[in-house]
Amino acid sequence: MNWLNSEAFVLFDQHIIWSDMVGNILGLITLALGFRRSLWTWPVQFLSGLVLFGAFYGHLTGSAGKQAVVMAVALYGWYQWNRGTDKAADGKVSVRFATWAERGAMIAAAAVGTVAVALLFKAYPSLSWDPWPDAYIFVGTIVAMYAQARGMVEFWFAWLLVDLVGVPLNFANGYAFSGFVYVIYGALVLWGMRDWWLRSRRDSRPVLEGAPA
């Protein structure tokens, strides 16, 4: 899969390689499918991870390892949405707000995970080009995917927090194309957040006996 590491084009003085372009496109498709609560969200997410794993394997083992974790969480998400019993009236996953206990657990996991992963990255510099923000984005992505798999509206808030670091970080390091992709991510996140928020309120309303759902 050497072609994945070859240059696709140059934009904003940034050399875009095929794996970045394909990965970013699949990432945008994943968010759009997630907004619609489509089961295809997870196969596309898995494919995105697989493409990047193939691009990184052999010379960037740390990046390949991160994509392996993403693929594992994508399989979990597919299982949850496909086999889960908590379905909305349309047969898709039912969305809800997390409980305070769930929120606390996710915040704690994100904090501890970020510190642990950042220390790992610092101990092995070849795993990351910028340990702390890279760890924050990686762990935040995993937490967001977990919340999405459980149908939690907070999934969108987690993605927004990732974007708040990802956008300025990419622009500051000269990755304008990647930064603009994160801006598009942010727009999709706000759109999806509004939809899931309103849907969670509808799904939580009790249906009167004999009334159409």
Curated annotation (Swiss-Prot):
Matches recorded under Pfam families: NMN_transporter (PF04973)
Transmembrane segments: 15-35, 38-58, 107-129, 136-158, 171-193
Any single GO CC term annotated in Swiss-Prot or TrEMBL for this entry: plasma membrane
Keyword Ribosomal protein on entry: no
Biotech uses: Introduction of ribM into a high performance B.subtilis riboflavin production strain may improve riboflavin production process.
Entry membrane topology: Multi-pass membrane protein
Record key words, sorted: Cell membrane, Membrane, Transmembrane, Transmembrane helix, Transport
UniProt-listed InterPro entries: NMN_transpt_PnuC
Record-annotated disulphide pairs: none
GO MF annotation terms: nicotinamide riboside transmembrane transporter activity
UniProt-annotated location(s): Cell membrane
Function: Transports riboflavin and roseoflavin. Can also transport FMN and FAD. May confer roseoflavin resistance to S.davawensis, which naturally produces this antibiotic during stationary growth phase.
Protein family per UniProt: Belongs to the nicotinamide ribonucleoside (NR) uptake permease (TC 4.B.1) family.
NCBIfam families given in the database record: NMN_trans_PnuC
Name of the protein described by the UniProt record: Riboflavin/roseoflavin transporter RibM
